[in-house]
Each structure stands twice: as structure tokens, then as C-alpha cells.
């Protein structure tokens, strides 16, 4: 038990998922959402893993809820766990690479949806929230080199 642990219990990170969704009809693009809730801004689709749910099912569910897309998960990309990555609480995110067909439609926590070339994020007109700029940069590096991001502390 540490000084940050509440008396009589543990404070564990909250599991989340984020999804890098590539559209079959728009190569070189990713799907982004404008968050309705704080922190507001552009983000990758994603959210919290529900109790009793595995991370892959959570990714498919969150993608459908926020974009209306039925995604096919291609690979588990990386885990991001910096305690400062989410200003609301300590989260850890399992990030997936997925593909989908069709037009995304904003729903649930998404106030808007955008399809943006991943080498031109400035076209979104605002910054990415959380650590999503790092995730996208790591993904671009992976696409160019085949090298996954190193573990971070």
C-alpha cells in the first residue's frame, strides 16, 4: 500500500480501448470523433471496457456506438498507460487497428465524425485530446517502418 492508495483498498487504472479505423474506400485515412463530453476535442473512437467484457469486444462495440461502423479488428497495436494520458483518471488503453466499409455517422459520445488523412491531422481544425496524437504518430511510424513503439514509462 502506498501513500496514494485509499485506506482499505486499491486504486487501479481503468481499462479503455481506442481504435485506429481505416476505411476500405478511403486508403490513407483514419476516422476521428469530436467528443461531446470533457475533455472536448478530436479523438480516436474508443471508450471504457465494461465489466465482464473483453477488450476486443469493447473495441468493436465502441466503434459501432460512436461511428456506426462495423469494424473488423486486424491487430492489437499497443498499450498506452501513462498515468497522465487522461485528465479525468488513470486509464490504460489497448489500441487496435481496424478496417471498415461505409460512411461513419456520429452517435453516442461523438458530436461529429471526420475522415482525415493521417498525414494531415491539421485538417481536423483542432488538436487531438488525451495522448491520441502520440498514438497516431506511433501508428504512422509503424506503417512506414514496420516497427512498433517501444514500451514507455
Question: Where are the predicted features?
Answer:
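Acidic, metal-coordinating catalytic segment for phosphate/diphosphate chemistry
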Residues: 1-20, 26
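Residue-level preference for beta-strand/loop junctions
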Residues: 13, 40, 88-92
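Conserved Nudix-box catalytic region and its N-terminal flanking loop in Nudix hydrolases
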Residues: 27-66
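NUDIX/MutT-family hydrolases
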Residues: 40, 95-97, 105-142
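Active-site segment of metal-dependent pyrophosphate-handling enzymes
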Residues: 68-103
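Acidic/histidine-enriched, glycine/proline-rich intrinsically disordered or flexible terminal extensions
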Residues: 137-153
